């Protein structure tokens, strides 16, 4: 109305204490709205005894949950499965004669008429595996022709020998020489030798070509039988060194001994036997 005075807007600023009181009232109203009655929180029916281990087993939980009452149905696939055509193994054929029963069941796949007298072994797939004869024979970088090696096993353990060459089987051909340390021409594995830094130049030494693995292969000695000869004649055949071995030993050693004598103190070094004494540690020894 024209006679009434218009109300003036409240331009006075509220004090900070009043603002805090208003904010507190609003927060209480929000909390009242948020508070809703809650039920029991969801938890497993199998209480945990220790981390990862429950009180009940899987079979016990199967019965506790009554999972046996559930009906499971396999999902229907949209792709139609092709039905496999069964190949018949037999065929029923009619047979004449009153007393023959009228029919016979005959196999479609006939068995072979004749069988081999001996079983022929069938070759199996090797899956890329090579036979032992075709394995790559790697030689240690420290072992070269003329290197003096220390044998660690066998009857000649501790003795120093001269390395000649590597054979086809991967074994090392070594010699003492025989006159110095009683080690003949023989084979040894590179696992069981220590390569020293001492070397001899054997570039001019001629090693016979027939010194191969078959040359050193151990021959089987004949065992006596009671049928042959007398009953009490039970002496076994003894191993004897062949003349060929003696000739080859002299031919190789004569060439190597000349080169050994040219180096001072090398003969005594090859005669000496390697051994560890107190205070000598193998990992600190320089060979």
UniProtKB/Swiss-Prot annotation:
One of its GO terms (biological process) is cytoplasmic translation. It is found in: Cytoplasm, Cytosol; Cytoplasm; Rough endoplasmic reticulum. Residues 1-44 are annotated as: Disordered. Keywords: Acetylation, Cytoplasm, Endoplasmic reticulum, Isopeptide bond, Phosphoprotein, Ribonucleoprotein, Ribosomal protein, Ubl conjugation. PROSITE patterns: RIBOSOMAL_L6E. The modification Phosphoserine is found at residue 126. Residues 1-25 have a biased composition (Basic and acidic residues). The modification N6-succinyllysine is found at residues 93, 206. SUPFAM superfamilies: Translation proteins SH3-like domain. The modification N6-acetyllysine is found at residue 238. Residues 26-43 have a biased composition (Basic residues). InterPro entries: 60S_ribosomal_eL6, Rib_uL2_dom2, Ribosomal_eL6_CS, Ribosomal_eL6_KOW, Ribosomal_uL6_N, Translation_prot_SH3-like_sf. GO terms for molecular function: RNA binding; structural constituent of ribosome. Its main location: cytoplasm. One of its GO terms (cellular component) is rough endoplasmic reticulum. The keyword Phosphoprotein applies. There is a cross-link at residue 5 (Glycyl lysine isopeptide (Lys-Gly) (interchain with G-Cter in SUMO2)). Belongs to the eukaryotic ribosomal protein eL6 family. Component of the large ribosomal subunit. The ribosome is a large ribonucleoprotein complex responsible for the synthesis of proteins in the cell. Component of the large ribosomal subunit. May bind IPO9 with low affinity. This is Large ribosomal subunit protein eL6. The gene is RPL6.
